[in-house]
Amino acid sequence: MWINVTILFFQAAFFIMQHLIHSIGIVSSPYTQKFGIPRQPQLVPAAKICITLNPEFSLDSVRGLDGFEYIWVQFLFHDALAEGWAEMVRPPRLGGKKKMGVFATRSPHRPNHIGLSLLQLDYVDNINGRVKIWCNGGDLLDGTPVLDIKPYIPFIEAKPDAKAGFVSGAPELLNITWLPENLPAKLSIEHRQLIEQSLAQDPRPAYQNLPERIYGTTIAGFEVKFRIEDKHVVILSVVSLN
């Protein structure tokens, strides 16, 4: 997949430089639709994704990567391309009402639609000649094109005391209730954790608070129906789509 990126530089006058970026791989993710995806990486530790590198990349290209616990993954918000971009956006952390400049947020509606996620590296392997990089804590849509991968270096990049603007701490988690109570018994522990952790993040638009509404999303091949009332997620049904 070739991506046309246009960059503007200012010298004596404006001129345009065009540079083609070739994606290096693609993401396999339990999230096949945007609704329900964690808004940030590491919020759902059970969200395991796999990055499959293109055939031209051998194990030599990732030699030494397994020595790092976390990696930066640069990717394309491919599902937002048709929606364009805006200078001002409404961050969910501000209730979806107050606007901020796009460069002060992590909105997918950016000029070049490029995203950046910090993922926990699980392991690297080679299956049928294709390099696969398995990560935990994913926040990426299935089929996302990957542009670059770099190791996370804590002593350089970790700044826990840095100001964080309008973002104050981790979001509050919702409590989970299964109805009927024996519903999760039909699921594996991994699938149950993934569904619970994903819905505890409250995937609804920030401006939406309709306790009587039943929502639906698809997670790891399951159609999940739920409603949210008084900081509780009530999971009503989980149906396999396979």
Name each region found by the language model.
Residues M17-D60, L65-G67, Y152-S198, A206, ...:
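Arg/Lys-rich, positively charged N-terminal/basic patches that mediate binding to nucleic acids
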Residues Q18-S23, H109-L118, A220:
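Short coil-to-beta-strand transition motifs
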Residues S28, L119-D122:
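Conserved positions in beta-strands of structured domains
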Residues T32, V124-R130:
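Short, conserved beta-turn/loop elements at beta-strand boundaries and strand-helix junctions
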Residues V62-G115, Y207-P211:
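Active-site-adjacent substructure of cysteine-protease-like catalytic cores
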Residues G129-Y152, S240-N242:
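Short solvent-exposed strand/turn elements
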Residues E229-N242:
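Enriched for short, Lys/Arg-rich terminal
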